[in-house]
UniProtKB/Swiss-Prot annotation, chains A, B, C, D:
Homotetramer; dimer of dimers. It comes from Methanopyrus kandleri (strain AV19 / DSM 6324 / JCM 9639 / NBRC 100938). The active site is at H96 (electrophile), E144 (proton acceptor). It catalyses: D-glyceraldehyde 3-phosphate = dihydroxyacetone phosphate. Involved in the gluconeogenesis. Catalyzes stereospecifically the conversion of dihydroxyacetone phosphate (DHAP) to D-glyceraldehyde-3-phosphate (G3P). CDD domains: TIM. Pathway: Carbohydrate biosynthesis; gluconeogenesis; Carbohydrate degradation; glycolysis; D-glyceraldehyde 3-phosphate from glycerone phosphate: step 1/1. Its EC number is 5.3.1.1. GO terms for molecular function: triose-phosphate isomerase activity. PANTHER family: TRIOSEPHOSPHATE ISOMERASE (PTHR21139:SF42). Substrate binds at N10, F11, K12, I149, G184, A205, S206. InterPro entries: Aldolase_TIM, TIM_sf, Triosephosphate_isomerase, Triosephosphate_isomerase_arc, Triosephosphate_isomerase_AS. This is Triosephosphate isomerase. Belongs to the triosephosphate isomerase family.
Amino acid sequence: MLRVPPVIVNFKAYSEAVGENALRLARVAAEVSEETGVEVGICPPHVDLRDVVREVGDEVTVLAQAVDAAEPGGRTGHVTPEMVVEAGADGTLLNHSERRMLLEDLKDVCRACINEGLLTIVCASDALAARAAGALSPHAVAVEPPELIGTGTPVSKADPEVVERSVEVVKEVSEETAVLCGAGITDGSDVRAAVELGADGVLVASGVVLADDPKEALLDLISGLE
Amino acid sequence: MLRVPPVIVNFKAYSEAVGENALRLARVAAEVSEETGVEVGICPPHVDLRDVVREVGDEVTVLAQAVDAAEPGGRTGHVTPEMVVEAGADGTLLNHSERRMLLEDLKDVCRACINEGLLTIVCASDALAARAAGALSPHAVAVEPPELIGTGTPVSKADPEVVERSVEVVKEVSEETAVLCGAGITDGSDVRAAVELGADGVLVASGVVLADDPKEALLDLISGLE
Amino acid sequence: MLRVPPVIVNFKAYSEAVGENALRLARVAAEVSEETGVEVGICPPHVDLRDVVREVGDEVTVLAQAVDAAEPGGRTGHVTPEMVVEAGADGTLLNHSERRMLLEDLKDVCRACINEGLLTIVCASDALAARAAGALSPHAVAVEPPELIGTGTPVSKADPEVVERSVEVVKEVSEETAVLCGAGITDGSDVRAAVELGADGVLVASGVVLADDPKEALLDLISGLE
Amino acid sequence: MLRVPPVIVNFKAYSEAVGENALRLARVAAEVSEETGVEVGICPPHVDLRDVVREVGDEVTVLAQAVDAAEPGGRTGHVTPEMVVEAGADGTLLNHSERRMLLEDLKDVCRACINEGLLTIVCASDALAARAAGALSPHAVAVEPPELIGTGTPVSKADPEVVERSVEVVKEVSEETAVLCGAGITDGSDVRAAVELGADGVLVASGVVLADDPKEALLDLISGLE
């Protein structure tokens, strides 16, 4: 069965996480995972997906940052669920606040990804969006209030209610779906707060990618899981 | 409380339903509603919304065809929930297959419309989309497989399972939400089939708007409700 | 021939410019136009377009805020070029920064509007976008750097080069196309600066719509044309 | 200076052109280029871009299928101009009919790609769109009437006027910009017809990707250049 890692690092389009930097960051994730025994997920850019899978695919959960609602065939510039599978990745994020989807496309691609055996994590901005996303029965919903993304002000402390409420409403519509939270998560105490609110894990980006020492930052985050 | 009319006629952008034609069609709906005692809903184009409300606003349920996820203020070319209220309309369609929305925008505008007291009907292409739409707790979800829209092949006969399944999954996530079905509905037997499958009503367009005799067409549809 | 008014007021979705307020503001524009002999353009919300045309259609140039790339027929929630004509309006804005269009849709709708005899004004964010918009040969291109919209810092003073350069490049690709500028325009001196840079007029919104005395504000703007 | 290859093969999302198949097709292109001395361009999927560059980057022109209007940083699921450069690719398609862009985004990304030294080819559906695309001064505009894509009915024979007219209007606004044509191109005679109409080359996809013998298909296409 597909497990949702309790810490997922979204590389976004940061220069610090493209090409050689993507591989370096991927190895950091693999080291930390091995040292701590905690499953770590990473989301490299599309162009680095294959290389990252080759480098650390056996050690961490590798996710695409997005997949398009497109079947194989005459589609230009799209990343299909089949391409992600073929590249050897384990899953994908969908509907990130920087890549919102039409409800109908999200529904199609969510179903296609689940059918392809991909770990499917749908992002949502608040509890009501999380409820709708949860109704598609993905493996996880990641609640990220866009106004907190990249701020260093953690959702789990700044807006605990959105986390608690999201856990509650997602379970109402899809009991098996995990709930992650994200936005502003930077250290272990933010993670601990998230878990205490009922979240199954966290989705982070700049807190690790832009950290002076990404390994230390990731270890610190994971310390909050204990 | 807001009631969902069992028959709603979407005027779309048909020349037969713009301007004077919109008013004529609106009066037909009002006559039929009075003669049969059945509540009828109509969805005129944005530019005709006010005139139609003035003409028949006391006799039928007047709905906008769409509303944008926009608050009053510096937004150009948008129709806000507040404008629809101010125009005196009763509600709106959202996410029609010809006007799909981002999940996040749909969530925002659905919440805003409900808060404004507007009858809020969210369209969906299949049962899974209906479940996600239902999770937003609108007054109704209208299931319309796009491939049947405008064909004259009624969803309630061509794909009964999508109707049954939609009723089932919408109730799972929002018991109070009504379920309509649409696409290809043209006569009373199509409506009867829909109701027997558990639908609370139908959403029609070309079947009435393009009929030789729209009044007769509408009366025929309503005969299927008995 | 269609003339481009040297001052066009975009009502946007401001509560101050919807319903009765739209009519009041429209009458202000008509009065000012009559008193000064200067043609004024106004862009009411879709739902007020017909009423505004009825009220002042003979006295001012009434423009839709946007038109969709849609032909009459099975299109829901769209405003077609034909609807704008049928409502009696004179033209439309297209591609406003709050309602950006796909290049291909813009091309289709621009051509359709021109063919329908509508005064067609395409917005653009900078000189390069103005050049591409101009290549479609609309009646006017309105250059509005989005970062200055609604700020009260006039483009004609804060970024004179974008105005001059836009005039130059639009003429390169379409000699007949007028060039307006907008964003932050609030008084006559801003208009004068625009005209001195080669602009044929201005596109304003909050500077008039939100003014304590819209008539005075509009008169002041027009004083800059002399 | 960047040269526009006279034959460019878009791999799209065909299963026949992903992963190992992408590499195989890339080697075919390299062989044909070497044997004929004609520069060939290929557009692999995002996830295969790096591997294809490693395999044949010195022998053929490798282009991304699309680039997003995004700068490095907090952007999820996007392919930035910088990523394409970093992956070692030579350029990109933009605005393909299966991946249309907002005019404003196209303008931003077109400028960014040119600034990054990427060979920038903007697709357009007809002569008017080609004129607007040309106004952005990309290295090439590729005219592809969407209704002919994938049909095997070549634009250069079915609609010669759109090719001639596109060449004419693109040169009006940007003399240095090359004009390619595409849609339905399958053999050398289609290419010859295109060149006789003034086109600088062709953009093909299924005609090569889905051919029983892609090498033979590509050689046949190139024979039309003589």
